[in-house]
Amino acid sequence: MNTYPFSLAGAPLALLPSGALWWADEGLLCVSDLHLGRSERYARNAGALLPPYETRDTLARLEADIEATGAPTLVCLGDSFDDIASARGLDDDASDWLARLKAGRNWIWIEGNHDPGPLGIGGTHLAALRRAPLTFRHIAKPGATGEVSGHYHPKARLAGRSRPCLLVDRDRAILPAYGTYTGGLRSDDAALASLMQTDALAVLTGPQPRPIPMPR
């Protein structure tokens, strides 16, 4: 598997092609913004109809990353579900699939703005996780260091094509959204530009993760 290795606060990390973050020394795999159940929520709220396959596609990619890394610890970095009702409304196949992935693992759900509070589906539920020298939370805090977050679904454009990306500088890493149908925020948006140092990189996801200077 091609990865992009980098260091944050002295911790050796790697971005996987899928957008997952792998911390081999801790056996920790981190994914952000799965947004499971998005098509169901859209249908429930009489919004645009989306093909009802995004949960299966997301879980299939997550299963592949778990198998590739053998991760004993999984951190879901918030907005794992599109809303609380989506967590309760997974169909039996998806619920069973998720249960198989969680079995025998230290599974940690970080609260997001779409899914605050305990979800009642097992695992550990936290507002943030401190695993020195890193802190994992859903939304970046200005001035924080050694921080891994998500929320913004960052994307960057290269050769006319926009792709999900990891944003990283000496203080923080902002993960791309892992889920299907998640959209994204351009890296030159003021919300992201204000968080990242001027020498930040955008690492484009894909079969061969590719670092470029963060577009501003």
What are these regions (language model features)?
Residues 1-76, 80-216:
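Extended recognition/assembly regions associated with phosphoester-bond processing machinery
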